[in-house]
């Protein structure tokens, strides 16, 4: 089977991770201690993508939980699904990274990283045919951002040919957690551009908007936000966990979604949106799902795809859905919104189907888009970065941990390059002279 090893780092990563495991345990009929009491063989058929079977009919997640302070992990352990995880897979330090990327990447995190890699190696050895890794973390803090990116590059060294997917919570314009978020995020993006295969960008502000606008929650908690993220994560991994007519795995997804190696930052959406307690009572149809799925209000990253163009996108439908209906709807969307799709990648929408819907829904769809408008998000962080870096504000926290200012400059220019690459492909059209187009292409090849 094609197993995936899951890592969660830092406070944000661990909380999203915990919500994810709660969601998929429910879908596979597992209770809080990993005992199977489901009703359908389909739940068991590909259980071992994410779970190891232990003795006594118990299933244990292939998850490694990492943090530089014990607090969040104690909370996970005390939560409803805390008994699910393998106790040796909790790896934590005592000092904390204090929202300092350098602490997570170079000092505190670097001391702990070998211990984590050992646990990851042990999990990987328990797999028949490891497909890849997924990591949940935020980019604004110290541990998830600094140590998370360190882990990614370490795992890359050890398993160069496996897929690396990240679910990264990017800092949002209005909801700021710390002052140094732009620094941490820029340094992290600098790493992700080089080492990740696919990055699903999630943005707290967009999640807040969805909770307030669509779900009508007056004051959403982080629990509500994490519930949304876990719905998307469960959707993205559906094809791996359940049999379906059109399956896709992390590698197929990347092949279909990433036209140029550096441009692997995706926007995600989910439909129908429901709040934690309520399940949707009205019947949804494929046209409604497609409509809602392509609605900018449904995107979980605060950038509006109408300001850019889709290079590629992928839709994953779950439930009793007719293949033909889906194809028709997707074609319909594409022909109505031609301006939002680049014309030099024909058939750039990929569809996957899975016959098992999420709990409490008849059907659902998950959307993954590679849109050039994601540059807004990097631009915004970059502007905040530049504003502080020009005055060298807060730099001493980083240089004190042994970082060099050069690294900041490099990260800044790498992120600016990323933005202009997105812009270049947004403006590109078929009609441009072939020759000049090829010349533009070349430098990208040799960047490694």
UniProtKB/Swiss-Prot annotation:
GO cellular component term of the entry, any: microtubule
Cellular compartment(s): Cytoplasm, Cytoskeleton
CDD domains given in the database record: beta_tubulin (cd02187)
InterPro entries from the UniProt entry: Beta-tubulin_BS (IPR013838), Beta_tubulin (IPR002453), Tub_FtsZ_C (IPR008280), Tubulin (IPR000217), Tubulin/FtsZ-like_C (IPR037103), Tubulin/FtsZ_2-layer-sand-dom (IPR018316), Tubulin/FtsZ_GTPase_sf (IPR036525), Tubulin_C (IPR023123)
A GO MF label: GTPase activity
Keyword Zinc among UniProt keywords: no
Residues the entry annotates as binding Mg(2+): 69
Subunit record text: Dimer of alpha and beta chains. A typical microtubule is a hollow water-filled tube with an outer diameter of 25 nm and an inner diameter of 15 nM. Alpha-beta heterodimers associate head-to-tail to form protofilaments running lengthwise along the microtubule wall with the beta-tubulin subunit facing the microtubule plus end conferring a structural polarity. Microtubules usually have 13 protofilaments but different protofilament numbers can be found in some organisms and specialized cells.
Family classification: Belongs to the tubulin family.
Official protein name in the record: Tubulin beta chain
Species for this entry: Aspergillus flavus
């Amino acid at each position: 089977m094609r197993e995936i090893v899951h890592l969660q780092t830092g406070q944000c990563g661990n909380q999203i991770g915990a919500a994810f495991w709660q969601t998929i345990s429910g879908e596979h009929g597992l209770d809080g201690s990993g005992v199977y009491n489901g009703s359908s063989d389909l739940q068991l058929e590909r259980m071992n993508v994410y779970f190891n079977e232990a003795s006594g009919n118990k299933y244990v997640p292939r998850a490694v939980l990492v943090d530089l302070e014990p607090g969040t992990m104690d909370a996970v352990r005390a939560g409803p699904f805390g008994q699910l995880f393998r106790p040796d897979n909790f790896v934590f330090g005592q000092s904390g990274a204090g929202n300092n990327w350098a602490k997570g990447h170079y000092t505190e995190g670097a001391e702990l990283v070998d211990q984590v890699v050992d646990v990851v190696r042990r999990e990987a050895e328990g797999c028949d045919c490891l497909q890849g890794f997924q990591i949940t973390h935020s980019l604004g803090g110290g541990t998830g951002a600094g140590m998370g990116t360190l882990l990614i590059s370490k795992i890359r060294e050890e398993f160069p040919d496996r897929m690396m997917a990240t679910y990264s919570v990017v800092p949002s314009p209005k909801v700021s957690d710390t002052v140094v978020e732009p620094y941490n995020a820029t340094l992290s993006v600098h790493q992700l551009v080089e080492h990740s295969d696919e990055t699903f960008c999630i943005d707290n502000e967009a999640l807040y908007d969805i909770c307030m606008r669509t779900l009508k929650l007056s004051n959403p908690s982080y629990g509500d936000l994490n519930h949304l993220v876990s719905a998307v994560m469960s959707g993205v991994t559906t094809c791996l966990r359940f049999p379906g007519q059109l399956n896709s795995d992390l590698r197929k997804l990347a092949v279909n979604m990433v036209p140029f190696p550096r441009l692997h930052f995706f926007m995600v959406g989910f439909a129908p949106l429901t709040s934690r307690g309520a399940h949707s009572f009205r019947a949804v149809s494929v046209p409604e799902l497609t409509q809602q799925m392509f609605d900018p209000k449904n995107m979980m990253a605060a950038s509006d795809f109408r300001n850019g163009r889709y290079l590629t996108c992928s839709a994953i439908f779950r439930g009793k859905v007719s293949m033909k209906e889906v194809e028709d709807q997707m074609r319909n969307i594409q022909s109505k919104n031609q301006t939002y799709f680049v014309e030099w990648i024909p058939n750039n929408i990929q569809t996957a189907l899975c016959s098992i819907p999420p709990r409490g829904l008849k059907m659902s769809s998950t959307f993954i888009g590679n849109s050039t408008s994601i540059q807004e998000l990097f631009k915004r962080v970059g502007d905040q970065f530049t504003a502080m870096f020009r005055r060298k504000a807060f730099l001493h926290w980083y240089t004190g941990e042994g970082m060099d200012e050069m690294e900041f400059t490099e990260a800044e220019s790498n992120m600016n390059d990323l933005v202009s690459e997105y812009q270049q492909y947004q403006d590109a059209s078929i009609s441009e002279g072939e020759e000049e187009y090829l010349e533009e292409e070349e430098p990208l090849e040799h960047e490694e």
